[in-house]
């Protein structure tokens, strides 16, 4: 599973990539975000064009740039990101195919274009979106929860939503984010990692929880340890994988799949 670190710190970013992360994300998305996420406690970055240039100079890892949702500014943002060395553009808050097609035209093959599925409209159109020549698709749980007016962040991982999107995606697929296996809240990172493995997730993000949990730790030790933990989950026995899925669902919903299965088995035919 590829790990992409959100950062504009050249020393930190290059150390994490040298330790085994696949690359860096520089985050330009801010238009309408403060209003959309008001009171949600989410992270809103203030990364700049110069930050992208600095991160390009700092690492040979894959460099992704999340721009703003599609609008009159998109062509200029794409041109600037390409000029500064972005390997891929990430287009957030997608709702339909028209904006994706316009962005693909504007990219014009100069770099990859990935999209973030983080609205119910995009979930409903996942098959059509996945038919486009995209470099990757990521399901963003924070904005999806807000768009759905839901309360539980990880609900789409247990109600079939992410499974349904995953089934449509043939290019690299990502969802959620990880931190060190023994950390993570409100769901332990080890259980979340197991569910990402269950889904066949190709990549995920390392964000503020990872950076906070890494304080005083050596990336050269901790990043390989995280990757090794994911590799071990991939080779787990089916019984162990089923048990972890039950633990994950219980952590998200408070309801045990094992108890549900037992209750169903007890019902007379």
Model-derived segments and their meaning:
Residues 1-4, 57-68, 107-118, 168-181:
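Short beta-strand/loop segments at the ligand-binding rim of alpha/beta enzyme cores
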Residues 32-55, 71-76, 92-111, 121-127, ...:
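Active-site-adjacent beta->alpha loops and helix N-cap segments on the catalytic face
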Residues 1-63, 70-72, 253-269:
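Conserved N-terminal beta1-alpha1 strand-loop-helix module at the mouth
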Residues 10-19, 72-84, 99, 120-133, ...:
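Catalytic cores of alpha/beta
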Residues 27, 32-37, 145, 157, ...:
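Active-site pocket-lining/capping segments in soluble small-molecule metabolic enzymes
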Residues 24-29, 92, 135-143, 206:
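Non-cysteine beta-strand/loop elements that form the S-adenosyl-L-methionine
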Residues 50-60, 113-123, 164-170, 201-206, ...:
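Short, basic, helix/turn surface patches
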Residues 4-6, 27, 41-45, 64-70, ...:
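Catalytic beta/alpha-barrel core
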